[in-house]
């Protein structure tokens, strides 16, 4: 959530920066609510002062033996009006909160302005060998197969997945399932062993309050999987008087960024305990409501996929250096897997809702002859922290909001796709990257 004080002090700057994201902020609605808030607070303060003055006057009149009934009558009418103003203020603040909850983060000044992915800026690329003339990885010396053709003989089974669950799911058995597990274990070991993250196991189901805190709700409700408990609709919960209790909404997580970042929710962390570096390997569930039929073949865009997530909760002064560090942590995974990739700085129009600055890592897929996203690393600054009330306190001074950062380290399914395609051999076998061989029982080649 944006800083309300910044909106009050410099609304036009906020509006201009949001326009670079293609967002038109409703200034009329905001100004109306702000005017109402100020009016309510001004009247409240005036009435409180009047109440205090009347109390003093009543005491003086009684001490002098004079009639205080008129003053007392005025004083007795004030509490009811104060209660009404308190209720009015709560309504206004809720409306302001609802308005701001739907507004994305402000882009950092270093983010290039742009409308779409076409305006993103490549920062660097890394190839395990010499590039071709166009700067991309050289073509394979044979016609490359895509990950579906390579994976099916190794146990990648989309027909069974479709029978069990429908489209955009995967079923794996045998060598390809083992490779998928090896990738996840390798990523976790690297992030915990070399990059200083603490491994976590988190719930896969969260309540709506958690999702509001990290920014998935309300904007991305259609991309979430809603969870209904068995029998809940047939046997609604009631209180001791028989009144129906509101059902608590629960959702499957779309990323463990949600659960890892929410560790700091409603808490004040001693500054000496920062940074918090957390990682987890979890399944992620997305409805892909806005995918528009893209990437229907294979594992690129799934309703369920695994990811190793990196989250850091840090002091505001360090967050942009931490962002660069986290990009390096994701790059390290790709380099050890000997996968060609490039780092892209997203423009204002292509960033995620809660991000102030985002880098995407895109891996090369020979069969598609293109780069595809495999990791996204973002600094959300205080955007999530304000929504979650996640703060820190130095030894001296008042609590202040932390900065939160998140990134994929990596998406396991897409890493599997990239390994299959980049390490394929002419006979359809897969050369196992050296770093994965200990996780594969010493196997060096996967034979179809």
Curated annotation (Swiss-Prot):
It is an enzyme of class 6 (ligase). L-serine binds at residues 255-257, 309, 408. GO terms for cellular component: cytoplasm. ATP binds at residues 286-288, 373-376. Pfam families: Seryl_tRNA_N, tRNA-synt_2b. GO terms for biological process: selenocysteine biosynthetic process; seryl-tRNA aminoacylation. It comes from the Bacteria. Its EC number is 6.1.1.11. It is found in: Cytoplasm. PANTHER family: SERINE--TRNA LIGASE (PTHR43697:SF1), SERYL-TRNA SYNTHETASE (PTHR43697). Catalyzes the attachment of serine to tRNA(Ser). Is also able to aminoacylate tRNA(Sec) with serine, to form the misacylated tRNA L-seryl-tRNA(Sec), which will be further converted into selenocysteinyl-tRNA(Sec). Homodimer. The tRNA molecule binds across the dimer. This is Serine--tRNA ligase. It comes from Bordetella petrii (strain ATCC BAA-461 / DSM 12804 / CCUG 43448). The gene is serS.
